[in-house]
């Protein structure tokens, strides 16, 4: 498939999830998203209203992070926070699974949590992304989560929060994609800092990229295409 610069930009969730991010930082994030035509801004739940107002009358989504970054909230509180974020303008949701219950092999809990989160998101026609936080998981646990997701059908499964010991890995993206196929999309996030990282994740099967380096990545891709005198880059997946 051939990608233009705008195609690449529309794969990016432009991210600022720092605890000390000010309204000025959020405005900058939204302004950059508008300038580069990114798909979404990824922000903490409390900033949903501010960012959605900044992005009013655009096709750029406001993505709220729920139970972030540890996932250590009850299902009920995650559902409540999700609905609150949506009512305050969020139109995409990224939530972190309860890793403790996964480690306990309480797959019924994980399945119920995912089902309730998908249901509350889809009630409002909002995409739901499930964050695995792969750095804490074995390959078998990643596989098990992907199998559950294939059954429950969230819109995306996601590699990482970006706040753990490590972020997205090409082999994990390939594994996740190999299980869910075209039924569920895959988002890679965490440690994607340059255009080579970005292209590697897309080639591995990522349908969305979460990163704070979106501007740097798009500018580098523009330069690469200019140097090669091309308007598209072909990606074989």
Swiss-Prot record:
Molecular-function annotations in GO: deoxyribose-phosphate aldolase activity
Record function comment: Catalyzes a reversible aldol reaction between acetaldehyde and D-glyceraldehyde 3-phosphate to generate 2-deoxy-D-ribose 5-phosphate.
GO CC annotation, single: cytoplasm
Coiled-coil annotated residue ranges, if any: none
Documented EC number(s): 4.1.2.4
Record NCBIfam families: deoC
A biological process term (GO) from this entry: deoxyribonucleotide catabolic process
Protein name (database record): Deoxyribose-phosphate aldolase
Localization annotation: Cytoplasm
Superkingdom of this protein's organism: Bacteria
Pathway assignment: Carbohydrate degradation; 2-deoxy-D-ribose 1-phosphate degradation; D-glyceraldehyde 3-phosphate and acetaldehyde from 2-deoxy-alpha-D-ribose 1-phosphate: step 2/2
The entry's keywords: Cytoplasm, Lyase, Schiff base
Record-linked SMART domains: DeoC
Catalytic activity entry: 2-deoxy-D-ribose 5-phosphate = D-glyceraldehyde 3-phosphate + acetaldehyde
Active-site annotation: 94, 158, 187
Pfam families for this protein: DeoC
Similarity annotation: Belongs to the DeoC/FbaB aldolase family. DeoC type 1 subfamily.
InterPro entries: Aldolase_TIM (IPR013785), DeoC (IPR011343), DeoC/FbaB/LacD_aldolase (IPR002915), DeoC_typeI (IPR028581)
């Amino acid at each position: 498939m051939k990608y233009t610069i705008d195609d690449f930009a529309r794969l990016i969730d432009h991210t600022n999830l720092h605890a000390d991010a000010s309204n000025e930082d959020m405005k900058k994030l939204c302004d950059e998203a508008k300038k580069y035509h990114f798909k979404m801004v990824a922000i903490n739940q409390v900033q949903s209203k501010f960012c959605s107002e900044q992005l009013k009358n655009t096709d750029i989504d406001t993505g709220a992070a729920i139970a972030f970054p540890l996932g250590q909230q009850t299902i009920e509180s995650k559902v409540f926070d999700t609905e609150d974020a949506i009512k305050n303008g969020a139109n995409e949701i990224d939530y972190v699974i309860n890793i403790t219950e996964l480690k306990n092999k309480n797959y019924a809990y994980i399945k119920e949590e995912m089902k309730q989160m998908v249901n509350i998101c889809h009630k409002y026609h909002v995409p739901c992304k499930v964050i695995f936080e792969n750095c804490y998981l074995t390959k078998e646990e990643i596989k098990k989560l992907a199998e559950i997701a294939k059954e429950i059908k969230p819109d995306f499964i996601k590699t990482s929060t970006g706040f753990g010991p490590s972020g997205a890995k090409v082999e994990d993206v390939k594994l996740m994609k190999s299980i869910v196929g075209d039924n569920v999309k895959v988002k890679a996030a965490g440690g994607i800092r340059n255009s080579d990282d970005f292209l590697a994740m897309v080639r591995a099967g990522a349908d969305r990229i979460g990163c704070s380096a979106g501007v740097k990545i798009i500018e580098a891709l523009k330069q690469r295409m200019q140097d090669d005198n091309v308007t598209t880059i072909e990606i074989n997946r």
